[in-house]
């Protein structure tokens, strides 16, 4: 009899898990509610929708994100395939056309013989069936309450935000220039809006005094560091702005000058018609967003196609609830994957789906496996979110600091990259008696 698994949520983690399990002959019932009820930041009915930035971060072998993406590629990641098929210029980052990216994933999932996409809300988890909960940081209220009953723990949360997107043809190119921090060629350059000190100070004052959407009384201002609203940063420190989203470093204009501050715009789609603000996540009210952004040089007549929004991201207290296999300690049939586990970011969420699916496959075959070690980014993230020494989990992006780098002073500048690749290849070899990882498995 064909083995069967339920997966709740068809975001990046859910789709990765479904893809791997289906490629290994498991029948997957993939539940997704977005075609019936979208949350505040979902815009399309496609699966694997990128709701915040359109970049999967750095491609560098020296960077944690580059290391993790290489590990995912070795594990036949659907998300990495979709990204490479829909890549657009983005300096040293893997930037994608978000619509083509999601369509690629949707087509792969819908056309897979072993995946049954069920468009309905799951309000109660069937504990008698092997299930992966990958419902994401915006889990519906009904399912969220059911998860709370199952875990016996309060859910944690942080506030996340996304940046506005504007049309390229509404930019006055007489007042902006093209530049890149990491790439001297034309490809991958960003649109740069130069600000002198007076303009910078005026813009900061606008941000500090902007009218924001009021938080509910029970929503304390708990932000994830990588997604702090721009207005919150402005209230904190001008220096942080100048060293962060408005940094002018290496953004030299056509006259060879470096402005006091720079606002960057990054290409958002394949046909080069849309651009998003780099590092400009915001909770400012929509009319205020337009008014304030129009004070920037070259954006006097800007056309905003998507305003920045803030939303609450839920996640469970994984160290108390899950074992190393991302399996609920008190109910072995239930597994979690994605941002709801406490990883933060697109690739972190997707990679979590891959690892959870491998653990589910092992469970279905009654096989105990050794998890990837902390020499790999995948193993390090898994160790971090399931480490019982954490009293209260804080969301985590991949970073070099969580790796086990015993010989990090080794001569090779690509030591961490090489070590992680060796570890993932070792991991794949250790599971090849029951899990097939590769192209010929679709």
From Swiss-Prot:
Q: Which PANTHER family match?
A: GLUCOSE INHIBITED DIVISION PROTEIN A, METHYLENETETRAHYDROFOLATE--TRNA-(URACIL-5-)-METHYLTRANSFERASE TRMFO
From the record, what ranges are coiled-coil? none
- This protein's superkingdom? Bacteria
Describe the family membership recorded for this protein in Swiss-Prot or TrEMBL: Belongs to the MnmG family. TrmFO subfamily.
Q: Which organism is it from?
A: Mesoplasma florum (strain ATCC 33453 / NBRC 100688 / NCTC 11704 / L1) (Acholeplasma florum)
Gene designation per UniProt: trmFO1
**Entry's Pfam families?**
GIDA
Q: What is the protein name for this chain?
A: Methylenetetrahydrofolate--tRNA-(uracil-5-)-methyltransferase TrmFO 1
| Keywords of the record | Cytoplasm, FAD, Flavoprotein, Methyltransferase, NAD, NADP, Transferase, tRNA processing
Q: Does the keyword Transferase apply?
A: yes
List the molecular function annotations (GO) for this entry: flavin adenine dinucleotide binding; tRNA (uracil(54)-C5)-methyltransferase activity, 5,10-methylenetetrahydrofolate-dependent
Q: What does this protein do?
A: Catalyzes the folate-dependent formation of 5-methyl-uridine at position 54 (M-5-U54) in all tRNAs.
Known EC number(s)?
A: 2.1.1.74
Which catalysed reactions does the entry list for this protein?
uridine(54) in tRNA + (6R)-5,10-methylene-5,6,7,8-tetrahydrofolate + NADH + H(+) = 5-methyluridine(54) in tRNA + (6S)-5,6,7,8-tetrahydrofolate + NAD(+); uridine(54) in tRNA + (6R)-5,10-methylene-5,6,7,8-tetrahydrofolate + NADPH + H(+) = 5-methyluridine(54) in tRNA + (6S)-5,6,7,8-tetrahydrofolate + NADP(+)
* GO BP, sorted A to Z: tRNA methylation; tRNA wobble uridine modification
